[in-house]
Swiss-Prot record:
Chain's gene name: secA
Biased composition (Low complexity): 846-864
BP GO annotations: intracellular protein transmembrane transport; protein import; protein targeting; protein transport by the Sec complex
EC number: 7.4.2.8
Positions bound to ATP: 90, 108-112, 503
Protein name: Protein translocase subunit SecA
Primary localization class, coarse: membrane
Amino acid sequence: MLGLGTLARKIFGTPNDRKVKSVRSLVARINDLEPEFQALSDEGIKQKTAEFQRRVQEGGESLDDLLPEAFANCREGARRALGLRAFDVQLMGGIFLHQGNIAEMKTGEGKTLVATFPAYLNALAGKGVHVVTVNDYLAKRDAEWMGKVYAQLGLATGVVYPFQSDEEKKAAYAADITYATNNELGFDYLRDNMKASKEEMRQRGHFFAIVDEVDSILIDEARTPLIISGPSQDRSDLYTKVDKLIPELVEEHYKLDEKTRNVTFTEEGNEFLEKRLLETGLLPEGQSLYDPESTTIVHHVNQGLRAHKLFNRDQQYIVRDDEIMLIDEFTGRMMRGRRLSDGLHQAIEAKEGVSIQPENVTLASVTFQNYFRLYEKLGGMTGTAATEAEEFMEIYGLGVVEVPTNRPVARADEHDAVYRTAREKHDGIVASIKDAHERGQPILVGTTSIDKSEALSDLLKAAGIPHNVLNARQHEQEAQIVADAGKLGAVTIATNMAGRGTDIQLGGNVEMKVMQALAADPTAHPDEVRARIEAEHAEEKERVKEAGGLFVLGTERHESRRIDNQLRGRSGRQGDPGRSAFFLSLEDDLMRIFGSDRLDKVLSTLGMKEGEAIVHPWVNKSLEKAQAKVEARNFDIRKQLLKFDDVMNDQRKAIFSQRLEIMETEDLSEIAQDMRYQVIDDLIDQHMPPRSYADQWDIEGMHRAVQDKLGLDAPLAKWAQEEGVDLDVVRERLCEASDRQMTEKAEAFGPETMRSIEKQILLQTIDAKWREHLLTLEHLRSVVGFRGYAQRDPLSEYKTEAFALFESMLNSLRQDVTQKLAQVRPLSEEEQQAMMRQFLDQQRAAAAAEAPVAPAPQPAAAAPQPTPELVGAEAGEPDPAAWGNVARNDPCPCGSGLKYKHCHGRLD
């Protein structure tokens, strides 16, 4: 008998069915327009794009109204550029992306082509579209591949990757459609907000982003902040000394919680630690672990414990070229250039005996959660999102729509086979692989870590089964290994296949085979080579299909069902046959930590012998519940982290917005004046309380403060003795005196130079104060959790204190800017000559060494107008007539180190 919910779904359809049905009429309109666009010439297609741009940018037509025509034009452009005609389901995926949804599309359904439709449509608005991928290889590949479609349509494509120059990045972001990784986009956003002028910024806004492998970027990596950091003091000796203590610990000294991936010292551990730290001299005599002065050493010891107990070689990291390389637990890729913060990376370096790099101090940071919420509109694609639909909606406001496949999925998903021990499981895996291999069926074996993939590889070698291994160590051969994984009888062992970005095609990858054949024989005719290889491939593909298609064998369940589904999804692409199965044991991490007791009872009930596997729906249900429990816990952690990060994010947006306003404003004298007046108000409040008499004022303290902050020698004692002088009079006189001082400075420097000095001081001070504030917030965040023991809500406490700290930072910012502007002065003639001599000495030294040298450091005081002549016998008399055309913002050819417009190009 059907349940009420099932009956209702049969009658009314699921919410997903209704969403799919709602766009069918749009797809029909696009199909109706197809003959009209097929009749256009190549130039006609480009002209259509120009017409669409006018209608949107000048005529005010909405992108929704334009969608059918734009999609029809894009479909025809792709057909001509790539020979690919988009299926109806691909058009549906494109519509859902444009509407700001996540389109769940199975592997092999052509997500890369799908992205071109919403990217093209939204690029017509002229604000730029970002297509986001998980690695640089995919960004470059997709930009080159789909760039042919955009070129056919008359649009420009850019690609952003590390180590490009500012000019290259700016050009890439200025393109209609820009391909980039999530990391590079986030880092460029942070770098832009550290620039000295708006002209130097690379990104031009955040209009629309299409995120490929959206679950990997917005969920798996959501907890990892992007951090731009600078070096701080070197403490490598301390890390080495602390590391020698950790192996002395026994189990009673610490408590390891594998569920939460946390480790803490017990009371016995603290006592042992204090004793050993005193003996080694790391803790001064008479000092306790609980003293405030011990905070630093306690932090280092805690990080050393985490490095030893939570981070394992070949699981969380590998050692290569005297470096610790982190491994992405979800994709198995090496994360080059990524380091753990708070001294944890240094603790791992000490543990492994590699060179210890200096700790870094945070200059700027942002999480992916908050970066991607900057976009006006966001869309995403993945093969697996339904299990995290609630999180996508709650955090990003993104709905998940399952797009129908072009052909029905023909993959057979078998129930899990559960063994009692890992040894029995491995025997079962090897036997299953051997059987499939002998039948010619290609096999993809999924493992969760490098050491497990290599252990399985050893077992297969012992059994005489040829195979390839794909993990972080074989990163360079990745494309070739994946391309061969669908060949007849191929056996491929891979750490997590999530986000690999390359389809496993039955019979192998035709394009890769063609490239290899042409590389081996450059004289061969490309068309003949392709025809021969396509014929061979078709024959091999049929034999692979007869053998059952790709067999995906999982050796362990992941904490997330989504990662398991991604592994399964590698098989059965585009209606191909396939099969998937997971081989598990009660000794697997997930089973041991989360589901072992319950499953043990189930297995005992079902009855089980040595070497025998239990395959039963009960087991699957039990496992799914364990995974759902872990997913719910991880979601709660991410939600809580986001609440804390939102506090910093609001402050970050305020600071970055203020910074941008300063860069865009030509004349900042009014902002500087407002700051100065506020500082005067603060000084009066501090030394001359409201409703007080003159004889109650702290005249001496006020005089020192006015000299320090405003650079004024004001006769405060004399003013205090005058009849009728009150706080308002003192304030007015100080404001007038400070205004006169700044007017005189502006006259001495010249208005343009003074404006430049104000801008430079404001930006430098904001950056310095923001860096200090980030460090303070990090420290607050690390201790605020303890407030829970006092029955106080840590989040509320964090919000209150973070706001107070932000206000304090703004007050300090005003004081520093005012003080620096008061102290800046024109250089004397002697100082100018000394600066020029120093500059020329460095220039000569650089020429002698035949190597570039950094410009001479500029003194704290700024050079005035007019600019002095060069002095000294070697200087010679500059001849401006010989310089040709010099841009006004370029360095002056005379070698003064100043801009041409402030030197020989000055307009008198």
